[in-house]
């Protein structure tokens, strides 16, 4: 059975790429979610007035990869302590978020947030600012075609490398 999870972890170009090679991930796309404006576009989202987040939609086969393993990639490939930014990318659209489609995902998201937060706290980092939201309450708006699989189309394109360097415990 496939499940869908939505994550915000900074610029969606590089974030989407992190999930391409995971066994069990059957589809990814990028879009906007979590805001108040209907049918937003990139230009509008970048103004910071829509409250939308740049999102990676991940469809995965739960018999091949667990929600925890998908979220391990999420936590370890951005800095969830930075609030409305990732590296040099600043704005509310770059904030850290997990939008869950069911109770199991929400439970795993909350547990891994707590576990990763303990690791980061022990290392002296700031608290995690990641929002955990119900995806069913926030429409996912597919981003423009030129954003989809951006780093395949533009192999030398921008890929934010902000992360903490710490691992989620097993």
Q: What positions do the PLM features span?
A:
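Flexible coil/turn and secondary-structure edge motifs
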Residues: 1-170
């Amino acid at each position: 059975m496939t499940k869908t999870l939505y994550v915000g972890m900074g610029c969606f170009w590089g974030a989407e790429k992190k999930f391409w090679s995971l066994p069990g991930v059957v589809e990814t796309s990028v879009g906007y979610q979590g805001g108040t404006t209907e049918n937003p576009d990139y230009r509008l989202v970048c103004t910071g007035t829509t409250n939308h987040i740049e999102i990676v939609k991940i469809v995965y086969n739960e018999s091949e990869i667990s929600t925890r393993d998908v979220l391990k990639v999420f936590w370890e490939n951005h800095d969830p302590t930075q609030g409305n930014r990732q590296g040099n990318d600043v704005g509310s659209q770059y904030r850290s978020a997990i939008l869950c489609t069911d109770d199991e995902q929400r439970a795993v998201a909350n547990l891994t947030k707590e576990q990763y937060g303990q690791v980061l706290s022990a290392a002296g980092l700031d608290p995690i600012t990641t929002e955990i939201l119900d995806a069913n309450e926030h429409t996912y708006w597919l981003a423009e075609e030129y954003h989809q699989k951006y780093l395949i189309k533009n192999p030398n394109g921008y890929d934010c490398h902000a992360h903490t360097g710490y691992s989620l415990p097993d």
